[in-house]
Each structure stands twice: as C-alpha cells, then as structure tokens.
Amino acid sequence: MVLTARQRDELNQAIHQYLLISYQQSAQLFKTEAAVKDGQIEADLLEKKWNSIVRLSKRVITLEQQVEQLNEQLAQAQAGKIQFNKSDDEQRLTPIEKFKLEGHRAGVNCVAFHPQYQILGSASDDGSIKLWDYESGHFEKTLKGHTSNVNCLAFDPTGKYICSASSDLSIKIWELKNHTCVKTLIGHEHSVSTVQFSDHGDFILSASRDKNIKLWEVATGFCKKTFSEHQEWVRCAVFSNDEKQIASCSQDQMIYIWVIDSGQVLHQLSGHEHVVEQVKYIPEHGAKQILTQQQQQNIQTINLLVSVSRDKEIKIWNTILGTNLFTLSGHDNWVNGVSFHPDGVHMLSVSDDKTIRVWNLKEQKQKKKIENAHDKFILKCEINKFIFATCSVDQTIKLWLLS
C-alpha cells in the first residue's frame, strides 16, 4: 500500500497515541524511529481516524445494498416485469424523514452540507454553530464565538473552512480541522443576514441589515467592494453560476442583479408584494431544461433565478432579460427557502405554513406536499445529493431521504 507523506505522518501519529495509553517505552521508541514531532501530534487523531473508518464502513454497506436493489430492479425492468408511471415518479420525490437532530436552545436559522464529508452544519439564534454526522444523526461539535444570533453559514469548496454570519455585526471564518476561528471580518453596521463562498473559495459575499452587500477577500480579510442600492434590509445575496453577477433581495420587495466588476445594477426585478426572503440561482442543467421548455433555446445565458417571498409566492426570473418567466403559488404562509433536486427539474420549498412542497419546474406545477413537517415555522432547507435538510423555529433540524 502506497501512502502519501501526509497520510504516513498521520498514521504514525495515531499509532504513537495508541502506544502512549499502555506502552510508554514502546511509544518513545516508536516516536524516535518514526520521527514523530511533538508539534505534529493532533489531539484525538486516533479516535477521529477510527470513527472515520466506522462511518465509511457503514456507508460502504449501505451503498452495496443500494447497488444490489438497483441491479434487481434493472433485471426486472429488462425482463418487462416493471411498469413505470407518473405515480412512481411522485412516490420517488416524497421526502422520507430519517433523523430529527436536537441540541440547539433556540430557533435554527440555517443548515449547510460539507462538500466532501458527511458533515452538516447548523446555525441558531442561541449564538452557536453545531456540526452533525448526517449519516448517523450524531452530534459532533459546537463552535462558539459569536455574541448574538448566528443567521447563516457556508462551507468553502475545499471543506477546510466554514464561515458564519451573525447579528453581532461580524462574519467569522472557522478552520474545521481544529474547530477554531481563524479570522473575523468587520465592516457591516448591522446584523449580517447571509454569507456565501465563491466557487474557488477566494471571496465571501455577505448581505446585511445595514442595506449593503459586501465582497470580501478571504486571504486578507479585507472588503474589496460594497454594493449599495437597496432601501431596506438585504435578506440575501448570491453569486450567479458564472460568478460575473450577484443577485440580492431585500425587505424593500426588490431583487437587484449586479455586475460584479463595475458594481452597477444591471436589473431591478419587481413583482413581489412583500419582503423577498431568499434568492437562489438554478443549477445549469436545470436552467437549460427550463429554457428548452420555455422555447428560449437561443438565449445564451443559463443564469435563471428563483426568489421566495412573504407574499407566499415563488418566482423564476431570467436575469439577462430581467423578466419573470413564471410564478408558483400554493403555500399558505411566508415562503422562506428553496433547494434543487439533483435531477435539475424538481425544487423543494419550505414555509411558515410548516409544509415541504415539491415542484416540477418544467411543468410549473406542485407535485407533492408534506404537511406538518415541523412543529413550527420552517426557515431554510438544503439538499446534498439525496439527503434533504430542514431547520425550524422549533429548535430542530430534520434530515429527509430523497430518491
């Protein structure tokens, strides 16, 4: 077996930690022969490695079972024993509750999936960030440092860092390896609503109740640009798929599309009749399917935007033309968040009406409704492949299985 230098060092550290428990002389000899340095030794490394092996083993078993089931279904389909219909599709899209995560002492405002590992982060009005193993449902760690509500969090693309936005006016960058805050970004003059890393992790985008949007350089912690046009609290700001533009939404009921290089507003999108809570760009493969359905194949952009509002509506926008493609109605209270199914066609939304709704964006229809998904208002949701996470004022996070 060939190990990288880093893997070899970590293995030697783990062996040394094990020997220290009962075999001190052997540990000292091994430390000398393996050249384990005191500064290298990371606390609980052996336990972390062992837990990783256990989790990976469980994951392998689960995947093997899924492969076996899929092979059986494939064999039956090839033999003509399975007939697929629309009801099968609707059944496939039904979220099935897997875990209920409890531990926060106040409402949970945000959830975020690690880009590589089976870690879910949650942010709460109790001022803490919690990390969970979403495969087992086990609590892992609490990050403390903010002095007020934590409103949003996001992982960087490498998974090494997590950033958090708080009502204490700050943004914090945390190193996951040591669970420590390595940088605090100061510049907003009111609560920070949302944060997002750029695709390469070089920049962080933030939105604030001070009516401003800021672009931060991660390496230096300096604010590179401020975008100011909104008249009220900016609820959310996100990068476009090509990262040439920014979309923002506000308590002023407006959505702005900004050109990052110039800092100018390209479009002002109006149509919502109440506070716009969130905007999200539709993934490229989904946007292409919608444009094809809309017979707009000649449009070169794939920057389609979804907005959700307290007016109970969800709107889909073409951000190049600055036009509303269509509106989805059905929720009975404020709509707070959306996430996109991996197939690119379906979208899930959450609301103060305590429901989860599944939408087909090509058909512009609601396909499924899950009643009383939480005991109180559902604030946000995220999808990682076929795991769907929701968070609520009821202080809990729920994990749902999708297929």
UniProtKB/Swiss-Prot annotation:
GO molecular function: dynein complex binding
Domain spans labelled LisH: 7-38
Entry-linked PROSITE patterns: LISH, WD_REPEATS_1, WD_REPEATS_2, WD_REPEATS_REGION
Gene3D superfamilies: 1.20.960.30, YVTN repeat-like/Quinoprotein amine dehydrogenase (2.130.10.10)
Matching SMART domains: WD40 (SM00320)
Keyword NAD included in the entry's annotation: no
Positions of WD repeats: 103-142, 145-184, 187-226, 229-270, 271-327, 330-369, 373-403
SUPFAM superfamilies for the chain: Lissencephaly-1 protein (Lis-1, PAF-AH alpha) N-terminal domain, WD40 repeat-like
Coiled coil: 51-87
CDD domains, A to Z: WD40
Keywords: Cell cycle, Cell division, Coiled coil, Cytoplasm, Cytoskeleton, Microtubule, Mitosis, Repeat, Transport, WD repeat
Keyword Cell cycle in record: yes
Any single GO BP term: microtubule sliding
Cellular component aspect of the GO annotation: centrosome; cytoplasm; microtubule; microtubule associated complex
Localisation per UniProt entry: Cytoplasm, Cytoskeleton; Cytoplasm, Cytoskeleton, Microtubule organizing center, Centrosome
Recorded domain comment: Dimerization mediated by the LisH domain may be required to activate dynein.
PANTHER family from the UniProt entry: TRANSCRIPTION INITIATION FACTOR TFIID, TRANSCRIPTION INITIATION FACTOR TFIID SUBUNIT 5
Family the UniProt entry places it in: Belongs to the WD repeat LIS1/nudF family.
Described purpose of this protein according to its UniProt entry: Positively regulates the activity of the minus-end directed microtubule motor protein dynein. May enhance dynein-mediated microtubule sliding by targeting dynein to the microtubule plus end. Required for several dynein- and microtubule-dependent processes.
HAMAP family: lis1 (MF_03141)
Name by which UniProt lists this protein: Lissencephaly-1 homolog 1
Native species: Paramecium tetraurelia
Upper taxonomic lineage: Eukaryota, Sar, Alveolata, Ciliophora, Intramacronucleata
